[in-house]
Amino acid sequence: MAKQSKYQSKQFEQLSYDLITILEKHKAPVDLSIMALGNLVSNILLENIQTETQRMVLADTFSTALKNSLKAR
């Protein structure tokens, strides 16, 4: 989704591959995959970002980036 990242491409690609592999291993249909990934994102924000305002800004930024990445395809 991101056009620029502070993370190395290899690190990002490996993490993405691992997440996809887990979903495939469980034969998760699209709706279940999206639910699980959404829950993961929610938990990451709730556990790591202290204020609700900051969480909402990050959630909005993430949502916009996701929508933009779908337009590009």
From Swiss-Prot:
Gene3D superfamilies linked: YejL-like (1.10.3390.10)
Entry-linked Pfam families: DUF1414 (PF07208)
Family indicated by similarity: Belongs to the UPF0352 family.
Protein name: UPF0352 protein HD_1515
The organism of origin for this protein: Haemophilus ducreyi (strain 35000HP / ATCC 700724)
